[in-house]
């Protein structure tokens, strides 16, 4: 769910934010009426130093990055390799480092871990990893154990490497077929991809499905997130961009990047190195 704001200021006129109804509040943990969000677990978080879009030489390697509010990085368990031990969901929390929400798990042996929060999970639910786990939201197991047609997320590309695919807000992949030690998944992009049947995945869809409907409403909110302005190439000088310069406006050339590469329609995949694990590409 998301909420719109009354246009009492120019910045709130277009503003659309998540309602955060799924998140656990301090009041729920302490038995009070507080609506403040839960603080991250100290042993599972640390301050993340911002790179400002620079590489190890100090050169800009990613444009339009810099500034923003200092962030606590939450250590997420993407491997889900604590098998056979049940865990209780202690809280569902906001994470500034990703579009999805995260859930804090309290295992019965006392260990605590963060995972990506699946859609519909709430405080008090119980999840488990490993073979023989029930096919319910939040449980993790190998792809060969999951029945056809079920939606999964946080999918490994190689057994034991940790989830790499389908981790953004609202995404899920569907298990289509199983043949000769491989499982075919339909990815959110529409691509059909084969993976080793021993790769792990978590049952369910990623939380915060309305993330793509949010509107920041003002430039300042983008700056809080560490996103700097994007200057048009036509507004630059010829020394700075292929589109720069000229008397007045001129649009008689192919759109290019600042480094002269064609931006629209140029194929980048090498025909001789096609990925054999992609059964059907994402083109409709």
Swiss-Prot record:
Region entry Disordered, spans: 28-50, 232-284
Keywords of this entry: Ribonucleoprotein, Ribosomal protein, RNA-binding, rRNA-binding
Keyword RNA-binding: yes
Molecular function GO terms recorded: RNA binding; rRNA binding; structural constituent of ribosome; transferase activity
Reported function: One of the primary rRNA binding proteins. Required for association of the 30S and 50S subunits to form the 70S ribosome, for tRNA binding and peptide bond formation. It has been suggested to have peptidyltransferase activity; this is somewhat controversial. Makes several contacts with the 16S rRNA in the 70S ribosome.
HAMAP family found in the cross-reference section: Ribosomal_uL2_B
Protein name: Large ribosomal subunit protein uL2
